[in-house]
Amino acid sequence: MSKQPVSNVRAIQANINIPMGAFRPGAGQPPRRKECTPEIEEGAPPTSDEEKKPIPGAKKLPGPAVNLSEIQNIKSELKYVPKAEQ
């Protein structure tokens, strides 16, 4: 049997530079931006007819899709509750 000194120093030193959370999913370098994508004006609405096709059988309803008075009533019922001292 060869006698080699038992040392964990190298194993510990090898792991010093690993940042916290490095092994979590999604850790690492962010995805690179694709520079070859065509530039699209952000202010211009889409002009293709495919995106504006109405759904068959759908009806256009007047007003917003949400009842605003219900939201306002619930909002008025909310109160600020201070944190209880322990």
Curated annotation (Swiss-Prot):
Similarity comment: family membership: Belongs to the SMPX family.
Q: Which InterPro entries match?
A: Chisel
Q: Which domain of life is it from?
A: Eukaryota
Q: Which GO terms describe its cellular component?
A: costamere; M band; muscle tendon junction
Q: What is the name of the gene encoding this protein?
A: SMPX
Q: Which organism is it from?
A: Bos taurus (Bovine)
Q: What is this protein called?
A: Small muscular protein
Traced from the root, the source organism's taxonomic lineage reads: Eukaryota, Metazoa, Chordata, Craniata, Vertebrata
Q: What does this protein do?
A: Plays a role in the regulatory network through which muscle cells coordinate their structural and functional states during growth, adaptation, and repair.
- Outline the segment boundaries, as ranges, of region: Disordered: 20-64
